[in-house]
Amino acid sequence: MKRLVSAFLAGAMALSLAACGGAASTSTAASASASASGSAAVSQTAGSDLDYIKGKGKPVIGYTVYEPMHYTDADGSFTGFDTELATAVCEKLGVEPEFVEINWDTKVVELDAKSIDCIWNGMTLTDDIMQNAATTKAYAKNAQVVVVKDGTDYTSTADLVGKTVVAEAGSAGEAAIEGDENLAQADYVSKSVQTDCLMEVAAGTADAAVLDLTLANAMIGEGTDYADLKIVDELNAEEYGVAFRKGSDAAAAVDEAFDALKADGTLQALADKYDLALAD
């Protein structure tokens, strides 16, 4: 399969989030690295990863921008299902979240380097991530879908053999392309973020995109900026979870917070607000 990697230059984002009991902040991976260096003393004295995170008081949460998980709304507020859920969990743990935009393709590298403390961004619980990180239980359902322009003839992935197909680098969409007999014969182009994939299909520079159902439901179709795009196929079902450093005890603490938020109705209310299905 021919692979072309396109370069992406992203400007640094300065965003703010109103959180329960305090204001959550956003920054870039560069500032997260500085934060990690400044937390060296905490790391040396912490008895566990959870102690390390609580000692800092601000878990650094790695994310990429895409609706409905993490995005800036029409009022300029940083929000989303994962944004609100992470904030609610942090409140349970007695800490304040700091959201840092990352390169999704190097997410585990940044996690291990302590540039970030967790990956929380509609992250599919793949075998690879579960082998290389400590993951929480699944909290939401998702699927990888094929998105094309209206009017495109499509009956199966066989129609995309030799065509240009895009997905986010290092994503479950990329894995779905590599694992599909027909899509593996497409002219695959990786993109830095999923939203770029929609832009490519809309512009006609790509024939199809493979990306998250959650994003497609929120960003394409009538009433959106991509009204002429449509979902034509669902490739596989999957679930979202959160990843911490391998061996971390923080994942179990987040699981307990999930249970509490499910019991008090917060988790279901967020799912209803953002039109997501919770994991069983």
Show the residue positions of the predicted features.
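A ligand-binding cleft/hinge motif common to bilobed small-molecule-binding domains
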Residues: 123-131, 176-179, 202-203, 207-236
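Flexible hinge/capping segments at coil-to-helix
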Residues: 148-165
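Periplasmic-binding protein-like
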Residues: 141-148, 213, 217, 221-259, ...
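Bacterial lipoprotein signal-peptidase II cleavage site
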Residues: 18-39
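Extended ligand-binding regions for polar small-molecule ligands
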Residues: 23, 83-92, 171, 217, ...
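Short helices/loops that flank or line small-molecule/ion binding pockets
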Residues: 91-92, 100-101, 105-119, 132-134, ...
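Extracytoplasmic small-molecule ligand-binding "clamshell" domains
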Residues: 41-122
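Ligand-binding clefts/hinges and TM-proximal coupling segments of bilobed small-molecule sensing domains
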Residues: 172-192, 227-231, 259-280
